[in-house]
Amino acid sequence: MSRAHMLANLGGVIVPFLAFLVAVVLLWNTVVGWTDIAILTVGYLLTGIGITVGFHRLLTHRSFKTYGGIRYALAALGSMAVEGPVLAWVSDHRKHHQFSDREGDPHSPHLAEGARPVAVLKGLFHAHVGWLFVEEGRANSRRYAPDLMADRGMRIVDRTFPWLVVVSLIVPFGAGYLLSGSLWGGFTGLLWGGFVRIFLLHHVTFSINSICHLWGTRRFRCDDESRNVFWLSILSFGEAWHHNHHAFPTSAFHGLKRWEVDPGGLFIVTLERFGLAWNVVRITPERQERKEVASNTA
């Protein structure tokens, strides 16, 4: 990893965190309005769907098919989550599945030696953010994402990542300015809909890599340490049913039981019902039963 790449990742983690602290101070002093919360919510939903449905379920695992325009729109929205360019993100994630919780996994929390609290914390930190300064972007896209490399439109989305990041900050500023009629409204729109949104979405996503490989429940026979973490399911758009996902990586749905809330899966179903998605991968109850262990383990 180049020094410039490492510094960019460092800025991408620290700047949203500092902005979050500023937002907490403003919130404490009630300097926040419903407009700011609305801009934050809309931005979180759009870019969260971009990561969950676009980068992950569609582009990484090809769990459904859709029109080119929707593919590129989801890839652009995922880029505006500021978790890295699409080719690097997909390549890193495919490598994660190839070596899940073994040597070669970019962000496993289980590679630190020993089971003492210090080792667990070291692994947790590495999986959550530490890997961004060591492993992120190192997976060879020609090896791990040749399908996307062959897609000219996806290469354009990948190259325009820095500009999409800028757009993801300009839009909430513009929305705040237009809705409030003041530069201060633009600033608070940028703060909440830009930096706080990025901070929240980052750490929900990072928690899938860290928490969901350490604590939670298991239902299926699976050769890694993935876990389902129910309390993260809504904020993560269903990604926290992570053990289900590792058991059936190509499934369009991570929530496999009726009560396993999966907003990302609901979005895909909505696309399907409007004729905008097809070849949606579903895991039958019979296939699930064949892979189930005798009882769930924690």
Predicted regions: what is each one?
Residues 77, 145-153, 215-241, 246-248:
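Active-site-proximal inter-transmembrane loops
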Residues 9, 209, 243-244:
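Asparagine-centered polar/low-complexity signal
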Residues 57, 210, 214, 246:
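Catalytic glutamate of the conserved HExxH
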Residues 1-206, 251-298:
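Non-catalytic, topology-defining segments of multipass membrane proteins
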Residues 5, 52, 60, 210-212, ...:
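Generic hydrophobic/packing signal
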Residues 183, 187, 191-231, 235-236:
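Alpha-helical transmembrane anchor segments
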